[in-house]
Amino acid sequence: MSVLNLSKDSIKGMLVGVNFDAIKISAHQNREMISPPNNYIGDSFRIFVECGLNCVRIPFYWESFEKDPNGFIKELETISEEADKNGLMCIYDNHQWECSSFLGHGIGFPNSLLSIAFQRNPPNGDYWDPPIKIELKKFWSQWWDRKLANSENKDGWELQQDLLQIVIDKLDNKKSTLGFEILNEPQVFRSSDFKKVSNYHNFMVENLRYHTEKPLFFSYVFSNSIKAIDFPWRQSRTGPTTKINNKFIFDIHPYPPHYVVLLYYKLVSILMKNDMIFVGEFNAGIKKNVTVNSNQHLRYIKRFLDFSLYGATFWRWSYKPDNN
C-alpha cells in the first residue's frame, strides 16, 4: 500500500480506498486471534491518507458484537474519530464470510443463532477448516425462509436489524460516515432465493430509513449451487425495491476486475434500474499467494473510472494473515 501515490486528478472525484480489518469489531467468537501493533488504527489511517486514499470500508461482524459488545462499540467510536481526524469517508459493512466461525474458518453470524439449529463444526473445536457445504446450504436456505431464531424464538432478520440499528445510531452523525452496507455477500443455493434476498433487503431498509438518511449499500449475491446460477436477470432481482429517500448503491466484488466481469455487473445494474455501482472489494484474484503491484492497482482504478463507478475499496489492509 505504501507504494501508492494517488492524486485527486488521477481519481477524478471517485471514492478510492481499502477494506480495513479492525480488532474488536472483527473478532472471531470461537477462536482467538493475534494482537495488533500499537496504535494500529491511527497509524493505518494516516498511511491511507499519505497514499491518496479517501475512503475506507469497515467490515464489522455480528459474532464480534456478541463476543464483546462494549469493546465492539468502543472500537467503532475510535475508528470514526480517526476517520474524522484524517478526512476519510467510511462505509460500515455488516460482513460475513463463509457464514460463521461456529461452522468452520468463516466469520459473521453469532453463536446465539447457529447453536440452535446446528452442531458445532468440527466438534473437536478446530475452527480452521472450511465449513461443510451441506451445512452452509442448510443455513442459507433457513435464513431466506426466516426459519432461524435465537433461544427466545426471536427471528434472525429482526435480530440482525437490531444490530444494524445499534451501529447506525452510534455512527450516523459522524462527518466521516458515508453509509452502511446491509449484508456482505449473501449466498443462495436455490433459484427461488434470489427474490427472497430482495424481500430481506426490503425488510431491512423499511426500518433502517428511520435511523439514517445516508446511502444504503447492498451486496451482489454469491451463488453456491448449480441450481442457482446467477444469470444477470436473477441477480437483478436481489436488490431492495421499497421506495425510500435513501440512495441504494450496488456493491460488487470482482476478483479480478476484468472488463467482461464489470460488463456483467453493469448489465445487472441496468436491469435493476440502479446505475450506482460501488466496488466494495477487488484484488488480482482469490488464489493463495496472489500478488498485486501498484501498476496493476492503478490499471484497475482507471478501469473503474472508465465504467463511471461510484468508488472502489481494495481487499484488504490487515495485521493478520488472510486465510482467504
Predicted feature residues:
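N-terminal carbohydrate-binding accessory modules
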Residues: M1-C55, T78-K85, M89, S269-I270
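Structural motif
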Residues: G13-L15, L53-C55, G87-M89, K175-T177, ...
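A cross-domain feature marking catalytic cores of carbohydrate-active enzymes
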Residues: F20-A22, I58-W62, Y92-Q96, E181-N184, ...
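Surface-exposed, active-site-proximal loop segments in enzymatic domains
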Residues: S26-M33, W62-K74, S101-L114, K138-E152, ...
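Extracellular glycoside hydrolase catalytic/binding regions
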Residues: P37-N38, L148-Y310
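Aromatic-lined substrate-binding rim segments of carbohydrate-active enzymes
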Residues: Y40-A117, V167-L171, F194-F217, H297-F307, ...
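Short catalytic/ligand-binding loop motif for oxyanion handling, primarily in non-cytosolic enzymes
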Residues: S64-K67, E98-G104, G108, Q187-S191, ...
